[in-house]
Amino acid sequence: MAFTTKMQRSAVASRSSTVRVQAAGKTVSGSKTVSGGKTVGSASAESRRVAEVQAYLATLPGCGVESGPFKGVWDPLSLAATATVGDVRRWRESEITHGRVAMLAALGFVVGEQLEDFPAFFNFDGHITGQAIKQFDQVQQGFWEPLLIAIGLAESYRVSLGWATPTGTGFNNLKDEYDLGNLYFDPLGLKPEDPEELRELQTKELNNGRLAMIAIAGFVLQEVAEPGVEIFQHLFFTIEKDIVEEIDIIEKDLGLPPSFPVPTLPNLSS
């Protein structure tokens, strides 16, 4: 009984000591406590993380006023608020890659529609025609297999350059020494030696890539909304319609009969 009482007193004393330590603003680890249950140490780490991310963003091309109408970093979803530098590096690598693919896609989209009858083009003797969104299904066997191999080789090369071994802390992370987007592919020697010129060129690439991503999405949606009408057909129709409508307004003001009928958009889906 005496032993039990002694143990209870020790427990009470221990709890009292803990309360006094916590009341003094310290935990056993020595970190100061703040309101909300966080410690000063964790708050300082969070502040350092935010500062590191903001400082890193300031070094990236395409994140300043030189890249567009937005002042500083355009981040409407506040993704950078909870990100690390590693996250930002991975996002930038993704943006560069998707921008480059989109630039090729936007060019190929309109070229494929305009060169469908060109003998040297991959049109399989005229079997590939019409809207670009329909041409995917018209491609015959013998094309996709080499393309898949080429894409696999290109991606393997890109991964070997920039991505860390996907084990432990290296999973889904880029190599620290990797220069984002630099695949050492410059057959024409266009890469400038001057850092300012290089940054300007990188910003232009980013802006063109961003525009291309929006453009290719718009191309697809436009052709889905207007079946059978190719992109250039829609463009030329819009220009022609605007011109005819302006002429019609002028003729009405002058009391003249209309000279041209308002064009209608053809539907080639049938």
From Swiss-Prot:
UniProt binding sites for chlorophyll a 3: Q138, E205
Cofactor: how bound: Binds at least 14 chlorophylls (8 Chl-a and 6 Chl-b) and carotenoids such as lutein and neoxanthin.
Residues the record lists as binding chlorophyll a 2: H98
Post-translational modification: Photoregulated by reversible phosphorylation of its threonine residues.
Binding site for chlorophyll a 1: W74, E95, R210
Transit peptide: 1-47
Membrane-topology annotation of the record: Single-pass membrane protein
Binding site for chlorophyll a 5: K204, Q222
Protein location: Plastid, Chloroplast thylakoid membrane
Positions bearing N2-acetylarginine: R48
Keywords, sorted A to Z: Acetylation, Chlorophyll, Chloroplast, Chromophore, Magnesium, Membrane, Metal-binding, Phosphoprotein, Photosynthesis, Photosystem I, Photosystem II, Plastid, Thylakoid, Transit peptide, Transmembrane, Transmembrane helix
A GO-annotated cellular component: photosystem I
Disulphide bonds in the chain: none
InterPro entries on file: Chloro_AB-bd_pln, Chloroa_b-bind
GO MF entry, a single one: metal ion binding
Induction remarks: By light.
Transmembrane segments: 96-112
Residues the record lists as binding chlorophyll b 4: R158
Residues holding chlorophyll a 4: N208
Source species, domain of life: Eukaryota
Gene3D superfamilies cross-referenced by the UniProt entry: Chlorophyll a/b binding protein domain
Known partners and oligomeric status: The LHC complex consists of chlorophyll a-b binding proteins.
Domain remark from Swiss-Prot or TrEMBL: The N-terminus of the protein extends into the stroma where it is involved with adhesion of granal membranes and post-translational modifications; both are believed to mediate the distribution of excitation energy between photosystems I and II.
Function: The light-harvesting complex (LHC) functions as a light receptor, it captures and delivers excitation energy to photosystems with which it is closely associated.
Name this polypeptide is given: Chlorophyll a-b binding protein LI818, chloroplastic
This protein's encoding gene: LI818
